[in-house]
Amino acid sequence: MYCSIYKSSKKQGAYLYIEKKDDFSPVPQELMTMFGTPKMVMVVNLEGRKLASVDIEKVEVSLKNDGYFLQLPPPPENLLEKYKQDKAKRNEK
């Protein structure tokens, strides 16, 4: 299965996978508005391939069922919360 991957012009780290190059008709208009102008990254064959930060099966299922897959970046790490947890662990010892 081939798909086209686009990056968002509005949300850093967000990528949109669609079945047909430049055919955004399956993507809800609200999502396209939030995504901004899509910038083509690549066309890729998903068969026998691993993707760095997303489960390939989820991509394939979403493409078949919805006609698109949205990859969002992981949430930013809360450094203050991490510091508090580390400090609490040190105090337990």
Swiss-Prot record:
Highest taxon of the lineage: Bacteria
Domain YcgL per the UniProt entry, residue ranges: 1-84
Disulfide links within the chain: none
UniProt cross-references to PANTHER family, sorted A to Z: PROTEIN YCGL
HAMAP family linked to this entry: UPF0745 (MF_01866)
The name this protein goes by in its record: YcgL domain-containing protein VSAL_I1068
Organism the protein comes from: Aliivibrio salmonicida (strain LFI1238) (Vibrio salmonicida (strain LFI1238))
Lineage: Bacteria, Pseudomonadati, Pseudomonadota, Gammaproteobacteria, Vibrionales
